[in-house]
């Protein structure tokens, strides 16, 4: 039997939509089929749990970035402003999968004190932690009505595997194993709940068919690592003339798509409202490559308005070393080239035509369920920041 022990530390996590949140840190102990464990946990929940929405997200920690969904991709304002609670637990001694390498107690996985030279991993810890949360230990999270799971990239791959393993049976109502580059060979046959997978063009692998409890999506032109302060800090060199691909950064940010799909999944579970149908990139007749338009952009999939109106060629992966380990990480960044200007022969004749088309593309995404209202308005606002520039050119000029 596993136990979420009394928190060793707690602190304010801020106030969101007039609801105060508290972050708890402590030790989770027990035994799986691999042996005993004692690992760090972290829970962020309303100070008065009953005032939240009683839906809790268990995040599998990422090997490099730890709690990537809560901190970077969805964000605290998005989650906690809507009343969700969040929790994570260490399950491996490799990198930040441990969640906290110095929690103030001995970390044990698979019956062994963790040693970086002898990595230990036990994914069963994640599902035991989720099940223990339903018991509302120490009244930290309230009476949970729905339990979700989420992971991105490295942690999305781990969650993919968890969802196919017997120990996860009937654990989660909804899961988001995302941008994991696994493709059809690892397509989960989940033992519990509904599944939503978003993959970027870089991560996209052909899939066959669909199922009532799964939805699969792919973002055209999207790199594995979306635009962020992290990517901009790595790629600071000025563009040259003629303009090469602006390697490492891209205005095709997929974070808004993921937020819309998260809300769609939540409504799927709580209201029975179907999410958008599976939407994938189009393949060549041979089925072994992505179809592209004359500009070189991928066809099909979820299409950012800048890509849909043809502002540039958007590249899902660029061949560029970056000054951080490990070396292969460069493949995870995107870029863009062949940027078009208003008045170009193969583009819009005037600014009014351009803005009208961009706005229509953003509204179409919103109607399809791939953009929230606030993100639709934000995209159109960014396209209008300069009366002679496109969304891509405004991005390139650093206006947003």
Could you describe each region identified by the protein language model?
Residues 1-74, 135, 348-375, 379-400:
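Catalytic-loop region of hydrolases
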Residues 7, 11-67, 125-133, 145, ...:
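Long, well-ordered hydrophobic secondary-structure segments characteristic of membrane-embedded
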Residues 13, 21-29, 53-130, 213-232:
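Active-site machinery of serine-nucleophile hydrolases
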Residues 44-52, 75-78, 133-147, 166-169, ...:
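Surface-exposed acidic, glycine-flexible loop patches that form ligand/cofactor-binding
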Residues 51-56, 82-87, 143-147, 170-174, ...:
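Loop/turn elements at helix/coil->beta-strand transitions in domains of secreted/extracellular proteins
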Residues 64, 139, 143-187:
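Primarily recognizes the serine-hydrolase "nucleophile elbow" in alpha/beta-hydrolase
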Residues 108-140, 149, 166-167, 254-257:
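Alpha/beta-hydrolase active-site loop
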Residues 185-386, 395-400:
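C-terminal subdomain of alpha/beta-hydrolase-fold enzymes, centered on the catalytic histidine
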